[in-house]
Amino acid sequence: MAGKTLYDKLWEMHEVKRRDDGSSLIYIDRHILHEVTSPQAFEGLRLANRKPWRIDANIATPDHNVPTTKGERQGGLEAIADEVSRIQVQTLDENCDDFGILEFKMNDVRQGIVHVIGPEQGATLPGMTVVCGDSHTSTHGAFGALAHGIGTSEVEHVLATQCLVAKKMKNMQVRVEGKLPFGVTAKDIVLAVIGKIGTAGGNGHALEFAGSAIRDLSMEGRMTICNMAIEAGARVGMVAVDEKTIAYVEGRPYAPKGADWDKAVKLWQDLVSDDDAVFDTIVELKAEDIKPQVSWGTSPEMVLAVDQNVPDPAVEADPVKKDSITRALKYMGLQANQAITDIRLDRVFIGSCTNSRIEDLRAAAEVAKGRKVAANVKQALVVPGSGLVKQQAEAEGLDKIFIEAGFEWREPGCSMCLAMNPDKLGSGEHCASTSNRNFEGRQGAGGRTHLVSPAMAAAAAVTGHFIDVRELIQA
């Protein structure tokens, strides 16, 4: 009998009942809530006269709509200019108060992006099932957890029953072997993976990232990779538990303590795929072949190494691909065969649930130190992923480095990742962004998004165009 994958093990641990139609009832250990996808779910509970099944399994924070300037934050709810945004944040506060759910409110130092605060607080643990009304919940899979996004109706279902109906996915292993070259990061790995398999490559699969290059990554790097499993077409991304996982979790506020900790660690050590586990699909990359990546088009799969040129639709034989390239070039305001390094930037955004943790900010600060934001860059934002990340960065003096270089140092939130708060692109503006999606209008109507790592974003900010960051930093 073949061994089990990590996904197989997590599924079996949480399968309450197998149904006749092939789906299963799955128990949910952790439910994370934010202001955008939860209001209707709470209203559904009220209308049905229900209460949350397990209050302590839920944790909440506002992130999508919150303003990130200090002045607006200090003004509290009334300072949120957009009425819908203000109502959503206020409604989350009221719902959590009414139902007794732990919430880190807008000006709590523990507030932040949902996928930053869960791991940071130890609310995300190995072996858990974790859900949230947000597609990038796959981030939490970095801890050897089964984590995925859910819709608003499912948010209500989890609140009411602590279970979900789901169908088991296929298994895909993405193996990245070897040592990453200097200056190449987790963000570059996952962009290279998406460039290789496409945004539909992981459809119907749970992705397990493995190999020596993945094991060498920090937990923060692993979170970046799992975060963008969704852009590879998968609902789930995960990394097996090892000593780095356990070291990261130990001592965090909601992690087990004492004898419970010892017991948990013993259980977590089995959260790896067996040596003889069978995967439906295996994708392999050599770490040494990966260079700093830059997305050029309107899909995350439209990505190239920084030393390449954007494609020419005239030489594309596939009519569908040809049309896609032509449309993307037009929207992005680029010319066929244009060098990536010739793309000039109007704005730079360092933040999001993909890249707003302390290691991300350190990497960007290393590039920014002693330099100035280029004259053609109208705005360069640095938005920490949580109040605690911000606090730590300030203790290390990173805020001063950014401010002296001409960056804006902001309060935590989703910010310019998506156009749901005051931080937006103007039409036609090019932005080097450490976020996860570059769809048309994602950062603002007509905005042109280029996905990069934090170091590459900082390099673009200080030079005004894309450049291989390795030209600016020392090995």
Swiss-Prot record:
**What reaction does this enzyme carry out catalytically?**
(2R,3S)-3-isopropylmalate = (2S)-2-isopropylmalate
Q: Which InterPro entries match?
A: 3-IsopropMal_deHydase_lsu, Acnase/IPM_dHydase_lsu_aba_1/3, Acoase/IPM_deHydtase_lsu_aba, Aconitase_4Fe-4S_BS, Aconitase_4Fe-4S_dom, IPM_dehydratase_rel_enz, IPMI_cat
Which CDD domains does the UniProt entry name for this protein? IPMI
One term of GO molecular function: metal ion binding
Give the record's GO biological process terms: L-leucine biosynthetic process
Q: Where does [4Fe-4S] cluster bind?
A: C353, C414, C417
| One Pfam family, short name | Aconitase
| Comment on bound cofactor | Binds 1 [4Fe-4S] cluster per subunit.
Enzyme Commission no: 4.2.1.33
The highest taxon in the source lineage is Bacteria
Q: Which Gene3D superfamilies match?
A: Aconitase, domain 3
- Swiss-Prot/TrEMBL keywords: 4Fe-4S, Amino-acid biosynthesis, Branched-chain amino acid biosynthesis, Iron, Iron-sulfur, Leucine biosynthesis, Lyase, Metal-binding
General function of this protein: Catalyzes the isomerization between 2-isopropylmalate and 3-isopropylmalate, via the formation of 2-isopropylmaleate.
Q: What is this protein called?
A: 3-isopropylmalate dehydratase large subunit
- Provenance organism: Stutzerimonas stutzeri (strain A1501)
